[in-house]
Amino acid sequence: MESKALLLVALGVWLQSLTAFRGGVAAADGGRDFSDIESKFALRTPEDTAEDTCHLIPGLADSVSNCHFNHSSKTFVVIHGWTVTGMYESWVPKLVAALYKREPDSNVIVVDWLYRAQQHYPVSAGYTKLVGNDVARFINWLEEEFNYPLDNVHLLGYSLGAHAAGVAGSLTNKKVNRITGLDPAGPNFEYAEAPSRLSPDDADFVDVLHTFTRGSPGRSIGIQKPVGHVDIYPNGGTFQPGCNIGEAIRVIAEKGLGDVDQLVKCSHERSIHLFIDSLLNEENPSKAYRCNSKEAFEKGLCLSCRKNRCNNVGYEINKVRAKRSSKMYLKTRSQMPYKVFHYQVKIHFSGTENDKQNNQAFEISLYGTVAESENIPFTLPEVATNKTYSFLIYTEVDIGELLMMKLKWKNDSYFRWSDWWSSPSFVIEKIRVKAGETQKKVIFCAREKVSHLQKGKDAAVFVKCHDKSLKKSG
């Protein structure tokens, strides 16, 4: 009888440990039951960023020591999004590796909710509340069991994972330090109430990168409305350079939405790679600029850094908390490193005859102390006599201090009979330029006092000149 009793006890202990490794345990302290937690929490290592080799199990204190959790360092919690394959995307180990490279002593935990994430999208979207609840209970347990400060916790959620992070942040005993939303999902969340999605109340600071908001509200892959303290819209947030939308539309038209997962990855995942870029290239962070609209940004009207009007993108963002969310914009390259250099250009077109041209193509070339950037194309919707126009251009290289610039007015792509006997022209005396990254203002004067810019002819040349207005700040 005694041997049978011992056998039953041993069997009970074995079953309890088996249950623990399947997603949770009934904790002995305080009677807390974690057995219904389905999400898994893997503490990955710098040596093996791709595999879930060691799991932290809520309610099982030994799992924390066995995985060598660092109680004195910050913790990153990475939450993936919807998946068709049921497997981790290739960006997960890349982000883990970048986090460890920047913060070698930190803990990088990857949340596995793959089973729930591979259902039909509306089903997986609904599961974000349960996943968020799992993550919150896990974080609360770390704080209560080990007195781990939540000020050391930074949640990073991609797509649906961003909303799961928001739910988690709203349910923790104390606010976590930061949540970064990486292109939070749009469908089912654009019009959702704050408790069901990512919002500024979910952490001490919430920053969001919006990279694929193309389409009508509620139908775009990424959420369009601001949901953080600082919401950044690279390249307007609609679509990213290097991502071929024409090809995407063609494939969808021919094959339907079956391959949409592959097609949306480029712009949707750009949010992740922009954040990775900020971790790896800390010496040259990209800058974003606060603006009321992307249209105003395209005119170059928002390159001010006064009163927190500009900010770093990604990891080294300044934690600015305003009453209203700050919408910020920037341009990027098509590949890492993504940083570019923004310039506002203001030109006054004058002449003896009243003239007006629509949708005119130009090229501008900038020459500096370090490098040059030539033949940058831009289009002005309108060019008219005695009017001043402001527009944004950017370079992919740091050209240093500006010294000279050239402006060329391109011919129309179509033939006009009037071009046989005359060519439109304007007189330009000065061009004003403001550099976003350095906040310096430069005035360029026509090399021949005034320049006659003629359509389809040689470029007009302007050189750096001195002007009293250069001393003004802003």
From Swiss-Prot:
Stretch list, region Interaction with GPIHBP1: 32-53, 443-467
GO aspect biological process, one term: high-density lipoprotein particle remodeling
Ranges for domain PLAT: 341-464
Membrane association type: Peripheral membrane protein
PROSITE patterns according to UniProt: LIPASE_SER, PLAT
Protein family membership: Belongs to the AB hydrolase superfamily. Lipase family.
Free-text function comment from the UniProt entry: Key enzyme in triglyceride metabolism. Catalyzes the hydrolysis of triglycerides from circulating chylomicrons and very low density lipoproteins (VLDL), and thereby plays an important role in lipid clearance from the blood stream, lipid utilization and storage. Although it has both phospholipase and triglyceride lipase activities it is primarily a triglyceride lipase with low but detectable phospholipase activity. Mediates margination of triglyceride-rich lipoprotein particles in capillaries.
Name this protein carries in UniProt: Lipoprotein lipase
Organism: Rattus norvegicus (Rat)
